[in-house]
Amino acid sequence: SCMKAAPMKEVSIRGQGSLAYPGLRTQGNLETLGGPNDATRGLTSLADTFEHVIEELLDEQQAIQPSKENKDADLYSTRVMLSSQVPLEPPLLFLLEEYKNYLDAANMSMRVRRHSDPARRGELSVCDSTSEWVTAAEKKTAVDMSGATVTVLEKVPVPKGQLKQYFYETKCSSKGYAKEGCRGIDKRYWNSQCRTTQSFVRALTMDNKKRVGWRFIRIDTSC
């Protein structure tokens, strides 16, 4: 988020996230294909590939989530993952959003799609951010909804052993405009600052009385 103070005049600023996610690409692009029919077939083939990948991700995600009969089924969070190793991709929700954006773009004409590309329009985020998976060992402690500091447990017991808790955190980048103010803000009229903001997610924690349980804790989720 961009914190601004005491403006001398109204200014409208739009920011756009700068997260990057793994995706699939065809060889070449639509402009190198042999005409409208080939372009349509290329889009259809790529859409089928995306659908196949998303279906596989959904199947894997269902294996991680508790069953409906489990009383902890509602504890699942898109930014928290239980895994035996570091996740190799962003949360499924982010991938699905990227997939939806792809489908929206596929329905545009080539000319409209080129002009709608943020890179072609010279758009930049108001604040630069970075995202990564972190472990409970790196977080160690967090603040819960009551304002108390709790210990974030590194491992969660499951029927076949233990899994580690991973948190997908997004924070302001240490480089760029984080310290100099928000990009696009006129320094003559505004004082601005890029600041990391937090949200609550469910995690397995332990309080100062050694009571273990699932609690909402704060983690960094945006800039």
Swiss-Prot record:
One of its GO terms (cellular component) is dendrite. Residues 6-114 form a propeptide. GO terms for molecular function: growth factor activity; nerve growth factor receptor binding. Its main location: secreted. GO terms for biological process: cell surface receptor protein tyrosine kinase signaling pathway; modulation of chemical synaptic transmission; negative regulation of neuron apoptotic process; nerve development; nerve growth factor signaling pathway; neuron projection morphogenesis. SUPFAM superfamilies: Cystine-knot cytokines (SSF57501). It is found in: Secreted. It holds the Pfam family NGF. It comes from the Eukaryota. Keywords: Cleavage on pair of basic residues, Disulfide bond, Glycoprotein, Growth factor, Secreted, Signal. Glycans are attached at residue 107. InterPro entries: Brain-der_neurotrophic_factor, Cystine-knot_cytokine, Nerve_growth_factor-like, Nerve_growth_factor-rel, Nerve_growth_factor_CS. Residues 1-5 form the signal peptide. Disulfide bonds join 127-194, 172-223. Belongs to the NGF-beta family. Promotes the survival of neuronal populations that are all located either in the central nervous system or directly connected to it. This is Neurotrophic factor BDNF precursor form. It comes from Eryx colubrinus colubrinus.
